[in-house]
Regions:
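A short acidic/basic microdomain associated with nuclease active sites
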Residues: 55-56, 353-382
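Acidic-basic catalytic patches of nuclease active cores, encompassing PD-(D/E)XK
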Residues: 327-364
Length: 480
């Protein structure tokens, strides 16, 4: 007969957080909302919420949704994902988290910032939940701890280690020895999981503390979903990966620099510390810290490891490709130092070399343009004939394939498009686990006049399929 494991009653405490109703479509929703609100002005709370509600109402099938649903979406986006900040006078404005996502369009970067500051207790939870966690002594950063479990498992065994939401919940997430007392380390948790597997020990999710009023227990899925949420967000951040049924989570060893940055994270919101030895804590005292919590989350920026970058193989491949042309066209042996920079721009640079390969002797004119020049485009390329092609690169990177036909231009970029006409191109690079493709728009000003593009007052562009054409990104592989 199999042994059954449960957390001892004296150590059991259910950690929970807001669960977005749009979690199955979270990447698409967050990108849409970030694009839509990033240029909103600082407004009184009621007016800001009305404008955000209008944005949410226009997403997907929400036009027929009840107002309560829209309000819930707004609360989840504001609280869990920190899309809104507040001034000292109570007015609201788009947060750095929202603005950065709208500007960069990299969902994996967004989720790394999100996980970097995610903790219990925190302002993403309701005040009474924060108070309960403080009274239990909880201080827990799940992302860092989960990565420490994988790190410890590698030290304990040479076998590949995987983790399930069930194991994480039962051996760590709901155990006060982990989340509050810190007497059970990540090494202990990894050892516990490995030994339970070896001894074929099963887990029971039927805790008396979770029994419902009707006498029934919540399902296993309901019990394990909170730990599962964090594991899923870590997949979206490219820290973990899944295989097959997505039941088992593995460390994404392709991103060790990224993983190490999280492991070295010392940031922690400590404004609740004064309450841990306080007998009575009021909702008002916790509520007073909400603005500081969202300011804390949004203070982090320019973390290099979080920005998408070429891995060593990609760098080698593109370096060989570009070197070929510089050596051939200019007799130079050294690779130009400005070749590598923005992830999307570098991939498009390689694409342009491959697009013109063997068809022109002018590849030396294909170059990245320094942002400091402010010319309104990222790359100078060539046509097969004698004309030049001026390319503005817009990139979106997500785990899943998402429906996105929106990007933002600057006034300078739009002015250049008007001046350069048919020589001006927008390359909208879309990257996800299924591949990399480019939607190419030539002469966006003309497309706008033909009603194939919509552009709002903030230069947010929404394009129709007829505005351009899709092409696969041309990629080189010289290193094999």
């Amino acid at each position: 007969m199999n042994q059954i494991y449960q957390i001892p009653d004296e150590y059991f405490f259910r950690l929970h957080h807001i669960r977005p109703r749009f979690k199955s479509n979270v990447e698409e929703v967050l990108l849409y909302v970030a694009n839509s609100i990033s240029d909103l002005n600082t407004l009184p709370e009621k007016e800001f919420n009305e404008q955000l509600n209008a944005v949410l109402r226009n997403f997907g099938k929400n036009q027929t949704a009840e107002q309560k649903t829209i309000d819930n979406w707004r609360t989840e986006i504001a609280a869990l994902f920190s899309f809104i900040q507040e001034t000292e006078t109570g007015k609201l404005f788009p947060s750095l988290m929202a603005e950065r996502l709208a500007k960069n369009q990299y969902l994996d970067e967004f989720f790394n910032y999100f996980l970097y500051t995610f903790q219990y207790p925190a302002g993403h939870n309701k005040n009474h939940a924060v108070i309960e966690q403080i009274k239990k002594g909880i201080q827990f950063q799940p992302c860092k701890f989960i990565l420490q479990i994988f790190q410890a498992a590698c030290e304990l065994s040479n076998k590949p280690f995987s983790l399930t939401a069930e194991e994480l919940t039962q051996c760590a997430y709901f155990d006060l020895r982990v989340t509050a007392e810190h007497s059970k380390t990540a090494h202990d948790v990894a050892k516990h999981i490995i030994e339970n597997r070896e001894n074929k020990i099963k887990y029971s999710h039927e805790y008396e503390q979770l029994k419902k009023k009707d006498g029934n227990y919540p399902s296993a899925g309901d019990v394990y979903r909170y730990a599962g949420d964090i594991l899923d967000y870590m997949v979206l951040a490219n820290l973990l990966k899944t295989k097959g049924t997505h039941y088992y989570y593995y460390l994404n060893t392709d991103n060790l620099d990224l993983i190490n940055r999280h492991l070295q994270n010392t940031a922690y919101f400590n404004q609740y510390n004064c309450f841990y030895h306080q007998k009575e804590i009021s909702n008002a005292e916790i509520r007073a810290l909400e603005r500081q919590w969202f300011d804390y989350v949004n203070q982090f920026d320019n973390i290099a490891e979080f920005s998408p970058s070429l891995n060593q193989a990609e760098q080698a491949d593109i370096a060989v490709l570009v070197q070929e042309y510089y050596a051939k066209m200019q007799g130079k042996e050294l690779l130009p130092t400005k070749i590598f920079g923005d992830y999307g721009e570098t991939l498009i640079l390689a694409h342009e070399y491959l697009r013109t390969k063997g068809q022109s002797n002018r590849q030396h004119l294909i170059n990245k343009i320094p942002t400091s020049l402010g010319v309104g485009y990222d790359l100078q390329s060539i046509e097969i004939e004698k004309h030049k092609r001026y390319i503005e690169v817009k990139s979106t990177r997500s785990k899943k394939a998402i429906n996105s036909n929106r990007f933002k231009l600057t006034p300078n970029e739009w002015d250049s498009a008007e001046t350069l006409g048919d020589c001006y191109f927008i390359y909208y690079l879309v990257m996800n686990e299924t591949g990399k493709n480019i939607f190419i728009i030539q002469n966006p000003v003309k497309k706008y006049r033909e009603n194939l593009l919509k552009i709002d007052s903030h230069l947010m562009v929404e394009f129709l399929p007829q505005a351009g054409k899709w092409q696969p990104l041309l990629e080189v592989s010289c290193s094999e």
